[in-house]
UniProtKB/Swiss-Prot annotation:
Major glycoprotein, comprises over 80% of the envelope proteins present in virus particle. The extent of infection into host organism is determined by HA. Influenza viruses bud from the apical surface of polarized epithelial cells (e.g. bronchial epithelial cells) into lumen of lungs and are therefore usually pneumotropic. The reason is that HA is cleaved by tryptase clara which is restricted to lungs. However, HAs of H5 and H7 pantropic avian viruses subtypes can be cleaved by furin and subtilisin-type enzymes, allowing the virus to grow in other organs than lungs. It comes from the Viruses. HAMAP family: INFV_HEMA. This is Hemagglutinin. The lineage of its organism: Viruses, Riboviria, Orthornavirae, Negarnaviricota, Polyploviricotina. It comes from Influenza A virus (strain A/Duck/Hokkaido/21/1982 H3N8). Homotrimer of disulfide-linked HA1-HA2. Residues 1-514 are extracellular. It is found in: Virion membrane; Host apical cell membrane. The record marks 329-330 as: Cleavage. Its main location: virion. It is a single-pass type I membrane protein.
């Protein structure tokens, strides 16, 4: 007879935590795969597929690179004096003017991009004895031959090209960027036809720097009908400094300067469409939400962005260890506590009670312990997000071929940083997951110990997270245990009396079992004695003979 279930003078009270049929696998310090009831993804692994134009000012470069817009390529005239937070260069961008190359292209591109403006101011350079505003069929502006709008191609006047010596002081309180060039003719005949001298020379200097360029005459691959080239150079003139230009031929002169600004603007190569929306973080793949601490979309970012990590997923446990409920004998047919398994269907709390008494069965959540666990887990999640969601952007890194070793070093440094961030992120999440599981287990144990202290000798720990209560405990009594108002003194005498009676019955049942076992053993012994006696009697009568052969 099972007194814990059938005797109206007793009751069973179990403590447990909620469970779900299919939990989420997370990593901890001690276990790579542990199932929890709930987890939050910390890695943003997808973008919106479009670049949001708010709050950042996005300038769509369309078919113009930033350098083409800077020089004034005819098809980029719409970008004159433009400003931006982020200049988006498209893969479809192309040059449509005289073929050129840029000395230290990446540095100039980065400098102009960070300035965030193409604001240009014309200055009154005096070029005496030469013809200005040269053009080329390779650079048409409308039906006529043209040239870069920010540059002035100087050629001979009549049959002379005098030595040019021009100075331009910087009397303002900001840096000025001057862009100039040197023309490399394809033949000696072209050289003399344009500049008279068989070999020209261009020297541009300030108090801090000097560059002297001698043209390289020779044929090159044809581009837009030209085998000559223009080399573009640039010089920054600080406030109080002076720009000096000296040349006897081949000079592509500046028309003025670009006003340099110190800012956090940038440039990005992307083919993602630009749309009207709001996002703090932009990647070449598109804008991404900013509500997680890590992202795996792209290393290159602009704005208040998430840290890039290698992992495509990092799950932070926001629930307890999941132990699905065993349903072999029904919900209460096999009432059991948290030591055996969790409870499914607890929708109003994480921890709770199940009871079985003379009035039937029931279940209720313990809101206090549930709220304590939730508050600590939410605080942990917020701390992780705040700790890792630093506002920064990672610009593109470019280097020319001669800077290959620098590029390799830069790539190594960036890869190492990403490796460290990825390792730190994984370690942080594993540590926090371990703490969360320990924390939720601790809250369960606290509730169990609190209940044990209330019941004292009035109940017995059944070893599975349940208590056998040795007195009649109706629903009001069960509720007093749950809310902490249970008075064990009221039920002590009844509990002691019932305990002795139940233990006595269990003891008698135990004696009966022992007597049965002893009787069975004696019967077996007597049967063996009778069988042995029969064998001895038959042997003496000669009915049984035993031969031993060696």
């Amino acid at each position: 007879q099972d007194y814990s279930e059938n005797n109206n003078s007793t009751a069973t009270l179990c403590l447990g935590h909620h469970a779900v049929p299919n939990g989420t696998i997370v990593k901890t310090i001690t276990d790579d795969q542990i199932e929890v009831t709930n987890a939050t993804e910390l890695v943003q692994s997808s973008s919106t597929g479009k670049i949001c134009n708010n709050p950042h000012r996005i300038l769509d470069g369309r078919d113009c690179t930033l350098i083409d817009a800077l020089l004034g390529d005819p098809h980029c005239d719409v970008f004159q004096d433009e400003t931006w937070d982020l200049y988006v260069e498209r893969s479809s961008a192309f040059s449509n003017c005289y073929p050129y190359d840029v000395s230290d292209y990446a540095s100039l591109r980065s400098l102009v991009a960070s300035s965030g403006t193409l604001e240009f101011l014309t200055e009154g350079f005096t070029w005496t004895g030469v013809t200005q505003n040269g053009g080329s069929n390779a650079c048409k502006r409308g039906p006529a031959s043209g040239f870069f709008s920010r540059l002035n191609w100087l050629t001979k006047s009549g049959s002379t090209y005098p030595v040019l010596n021009v100075t331009m002081p910087n009397n303002d309180n900001f840096d000025k960027l001057y862009v100039w060039g040197v023309h490399h003719p394809s033949t000696n005949q072209e050289q003399t036809d344009l500049y008279v001298q068989a070999s020209g020379r261009v020297t541009v200097s300030t108090r801090r720097s000097q560059q002297t360029i001698i043209p390289n005459i020779g044929s090159r691959p044809w581009v837009r009908g030209q085998s000559g080239r223009i080399s573009i150079y640039w010089t920054i003139v600080k406030p109080g400094d002076v720009l000096v230009i000296n040349s006897n031929g081949n000079l592509i002169a500046p028309r003025g300067y670009f006003k340099m600004r110190t800012g956090k603007s940038s440039i990005m190569r992307s083919d993602a469409p630009i749309d009207t929306c709001i996002s703090e973080c932009v990647t070449p793949n598109g804008s991404i939400p900013n509500d997680k601490p890590f992202q795996n979309v792209n290393k290159i970012t602009y704005g208040a962005c998430l840290k890039y990590v290698k992992q495509s997923t990092l799950k932070l446990a926001t629930g307890m260890r999941n132990v699905p409920e065993k349903q072999t004998r029904g919900l209460f047919g096999a009432i059991a506590g948290f030591i055996e398994n969790g409870w499914e269907g607890m929708i109003d709390g994480w921890y709770g009670f199940r009871h079985q008494n003379s009035e039937g069965t029931g279940q209720a959540a313990d809101l206090k312990s549930t709220q304590a666990a939730i508050d600590q887990i939410n605080g942990k999640l917020n701390r992780v997000i705040e700790k890792k969601n630093e506002k920064f952007h990672q610009i593109e890194k470019e280097f020319s071929e001669v800077e290959g070793r620098i590029q390799d070093l830069e790539k190594y440094v960036e890869d190492t940083k990403i490796d460290l961030w990825s390792y730190n992120a994984e370690l942080l999440v594993a540590l926090e997951n371990q703490h969360t599981i320990d924390l939720t287990d601790s809250e369960m144990n606290k509730l169990f110990e609190k209940t044990r202290r209330q019941l004292r000798e009035n109940a017995e720990d059944m070893g599975n997270g349940c208590f056998k209560i040795y007195h009649k405990c109706d629903n009001a009594c069960i509720e007093s245990i749950r809310n902490g108002t249970y008075d064990h003194d009221i039920y002590r005498d009844e509990a002691l009396n019932n305990r002795f009676q139940i233990k006595g019955v269990e003891l008698k049942s135990g004696y009966k079992n022992w007597i049965l076992w002893i009787s069975f053993a004696i019967s077996c012994f007597l049967l063996c004695v009778v069988l042995l006696g029969f064998i001895m009697w038959a042997y003496q009568r000669g009915n049984i003979r035993c031969n031993i052969c060696i």
